[in-house]
Amino acid sequence: MGKVVSVILAGGKGKRMGAEVSKQFIEINGKPIIYYTLKAFEECKGIDEIILVLPKDEIDYFKREIEPRFDFKISKIIEGGKERQDSVYNALNSIGDCDIVLIHDGARAFVSNKIIEDGIKYSREFGAAAPGVMPKDTIKVKNLEGFSVDTPNRASLVAVQTPQCFKYNLIKKGHNKVKNEKIQVTDDTMIVELLGEKVYLFEGDYKNIKVTTPEDLILAEHFVK
C-alpha cells in the first residue's frame, strides 16, 4: 500500500461568526476547532502524513498560540492561496511520493474515523471518492426572476462533504488543468469530473458539519459534550 496524505484546509474567516479570530481557531470546550479536526486524522491508522494549509498571515499565530498547546503530528504547514483551489494546488505541489490524498475542510471538526477509512478504501478502488448525505429538505431550481422551475428527485441528490479522496496522480493532473486553463471550481470532485472521470459517492454523516455560522457553533458545542 502506498502512502496516504491528508491535506487540511484551514483558511476560513470568522466573519459570519462575528468572531475576532478565524473560525478554525474559535474554541469549543477550551480547544480550537482545528484541534478536533487534526485529532480525527491523527487517530486514523490509515493516514501516514498530515499537511496543514493556512493563510500566510495566520501561520505565525498558529505556531505561537495554538501549536505549543497540543502535540500535533503535522508534517508541514503550507501557505494557502487566494482561492480554495489555489491552496489545494500549493499543498499538492508540496507532496512528494504519495498514493492517496484526502482533502478536508478544517472547519469539519467531527468527521468520523469510518468516513476517513471509507474514503481511503473507495479512492483506491475507484480513483476518486467523497462522502455525502441526502438533503433533508426539498430542493428547488429557480430562474433568474426568482421563480421555481424544477423540483429534482431528492433521492438522486447528495450534499457532498469532505474529506474528498483521490489517487494523487489523478487530482494533481486535474489541478494542473484548472490552473493552466484558469477554470474556477467549487470543490475538488468537480475537478475530477472536468477530466471526464467519475467520483464514487459513499455514505457520509449528518454530524460531519462545516462549522460556519453561530448556529453551527451551538451544534458543535453539543457534539463535544
Curated annotation (Swiss-Prot):
CDD domains: CDP-ME_synthetase (cd02516)
InterPro entries from the UniProt entry: IspD, IspD/TarI, IspD/TarI_cytidylyltransf_bact, ISPD_synthase_CS, Nucleotide-diphossugar_trans
Site (Positions MEP for the nucleophilic attack): 154, 210
Entry EC no(s): 2.7.7.60
Keywords: Isoprene biosynthesis, Nucleotidyltransferase, Transferase
Pathway in which the depicted protein is active: Isoprenoid biosynthesis; isopentenyl diphosphate biosynthesis via DXP pathway; isopentenyl diphosphate from 1-deoxy-D-xylulose 5-phosphate: step 2/6
Residues at the site labelled Transition state stabilizer: 16, 23
One Pfam family, short name: IspD
Gene Ontology process terms (BP): isopentenyl diphosphate biosynthetic process, methylerythritol 4-phosphate pathway
Catalyses which reaction(s): 2-C-methyl-D-erythritol 4-phosphate + CTP + H(+) = 4-CDP-2-C-methyl-D-erythritol + diphosphate
Any GO MF annotation of the entry: 2-C-methyl-D-erythritol 4-phosphate cytidylyltransferase activity
Root EC class: transferase
NAD recorded as keyword: no
HAMAP family for this protein: IspD
Function: Catalyzes the formation of 4-diphosphocytidyl-2-C-methyl-D-erythritol from CTP and 2-C-methyl-D-erythritol 4-phosphate (MEP).
NCBIfam families recorded: ispD (TIGR00453), PRK00155.1-3 (NF001183)
Family recorded in the similarity comment: Belongs to the IspD/TarI cytidylyltransferase family. IspD subfamily.
Record-linked PANTHER family: 2-C-METHYL-D-ERYTHRITOL 4-PHOSPHATE CYTIDYLYLTRANSFERASE, CHLOROPLASTIC
Name the record gives this protein: 2-C-methyl-D-erythritol 4-phosphate cytidylyltransferase
Species of origin: Clostridium perfringens (strain 13 / Type A)
